[in-house]
C-alpha cells in the first residue's frame, strides 16, 4: 500500500523500470532449441509482469483515494481498520505531517504508526485518529 507522495513517485518509477526490463528481455529471445532458457525467460517475463500489475493496482488505488473517486471504504473486521485509517487520511487529502499536527504529535510518529499498521497503538490513539479524520466507522458484532 502506498502511504504518501514519495512512495507514490517511487512506485511509478519502479513500474517504468520493470517495463524497460521487459522491453529489453523481449529483444533477447532465447534460441528455440534451448527449452531451459526459454522457460527461464518466460518465467522472468511473467514475474516482471506480475510486479507491474501489483504496483499498478497500488498506484490506481492511491490515485482514486487522492481524487476522492470512492464513496466508502470496506472494513469487514478490526484487522482491516488500520489500513482503512490510512486510506481515510489519503482520501481527506492530508499528509502524514498534517495528520500529526491534528493529533499534536511529531510526523515521525504518524509515519511509524502507519508503517506498522497501528500495531502498537492504543485504542485511545486509534479513536483520536478517527476523530481527526472526521470519519464514522460502523462495525457489527457477530456471534459465532
For each predicted feature, which ranges?
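Helix-turn-helix DNA-binding elements, focusing on the entry/boundary residues of the two helices
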Residues: 85, 96, 126
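The alpha-helix within a helix-turn-helix
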Residues: 89, 100, 130
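DNA major-groove recognition helix of helix-turn-helix/homeodomain DNA-binding modules
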Residues: 123-140
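Short alpha-helical DNA-recognition segment
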Residues: 93-113
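Short, amphipathic alpha-helical "recognition" segments used to contact nucleic acids or chromatin
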Residues: 79-91
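Short, solvent-exposed alpha-helical "recognition" segments
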Residues: 116-123
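N-terminal flexible/basic segments that precede or flank functional cores
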Residues: 1-78
Amino acid at each position: 500500500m502506498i502511504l504518501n507522495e514519495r512512495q507514490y513517485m517511487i512506485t511509478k518509477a519502479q513500474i517504468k523500470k520493470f517495463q524497460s526490463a521487459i522491453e529489453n528481455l523481449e529483444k533477447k529471445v532465447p534460441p528455440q532449441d534451448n527449452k531451459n532458457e526459454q522457460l527461464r525467460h518466460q518465467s522472468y517475463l511473467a514475474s516482471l509482469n506480475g510486479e507491474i500489475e501489483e504496483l499498478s493496482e497500488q498506484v490506481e488505488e492511491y490515485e482514486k483515494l487522492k481524487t476522492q473517486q470512492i464513496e466508502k471504504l470496506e472494513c469487514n473486521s478490526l484487522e482491516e481498520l488500520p489500513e482503512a485509517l490510512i486510506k481515510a487520511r489519503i482520501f481527506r487529502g492530508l499528509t502524514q505531517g498534517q495528520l500529526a499536527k491534528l493529533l499534536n504529535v511529531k510526523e515521525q510518529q504518524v509515519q511509524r504508526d502507519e508503517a506498522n499498521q497501528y500495531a502498537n497503538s492504543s485504542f485511545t490513539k486509534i479513536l483520536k485518529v478517527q476523530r481527526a479524520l472526521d470519519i464514522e466507522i460502523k462495525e457489527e458484532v457477530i456471534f459465532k
